């Protein structure tokens, strides 16, 4: 590895602002805001709008829309009947 070209990698706390869910992970991102973690050490805090704790896909609150294909929409729009 070349010296001096890689960003500094350190532990940070990611905070989901929607649910106040926190997790500690390694990152090159940093922040001036600090927070104490469960181990008693202080780490920089990165605020997230959405994480796996609040995203509908991971929480099971996802809504599935009936997605018609382009051909079905065309036939429905112009009144054509399918051959099936």
From Swiss-Prot:
Instruction: List the InterPro entries hit by this protein, alphabetically.
Output: Ribosomal_bL28/bL31-like_sf, Ribosomal_bL31, Ribosomal_bL31_B, Ribosomal_bL31_sf
Please give the SUPFAM superfamilies that the UniProt record associates with this protein.
L28p-like
Q: Which GO terms describe its biological process?
A: translation
Q: Name one GO molecular function term.
A: structural constituent of ribosome
In its UniProt entry, the species of origin is given as Staphylococcus aureus (strain NCTC 8325 / PS 47)
What is the name of the protein in this document? Large ribosomal subunit protein bL31B
Q: Tell me the subunit arrangement.
A: Part of the 50S ribosomal subunit.
What would be one Gene Ontology cellular-component term for the protein?
A: ribonucleoprotein complex
Q: Which HAMAP family match?
A: Ribosomal_bL31_2
In the record, the note on similarity to other proteins reads: Belongs to the bacterial ribosomal protein bL31 family. Type B subfamily.
Tell me the keywords, alphabetical order: Ribonucleoprotein, Ribosomal protein
């Amino acid at each position: 590895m070349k010296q001096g070209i890689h960003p500094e990698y350190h532990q940070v706390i990611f905070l989901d602002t929607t649910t106040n869910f926190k997790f500690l992970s390694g990152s090159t991102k940093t922040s001036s805001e600090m927070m104490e973690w469960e181990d008693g050490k202080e780490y920089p805090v990165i605020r997230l709008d959405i994480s796996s704790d609040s995203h509908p896909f991971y929480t099971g609150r996802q809504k599935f829309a009936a997605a018609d294909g382009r051909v079905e929409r065309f036939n429905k729009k112009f009144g054509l009947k399918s051959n099936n």
